[in-house]
Amino acid sequence: GMLGGSSDVDXNXP
């Protein structure tokens, strides 16, 4: 999640 989450659909973050 792009709100600081782990690697998910948006691929942001760690």
From Swiss-Prot:
It is found in: Secreted. Keywords: Allergen, Secreted. GO terms for cellular component: extracellular region. Its main location: secreted. This is Allergen Ani s 4. It comes from Anisakis simplex (Herring worm).
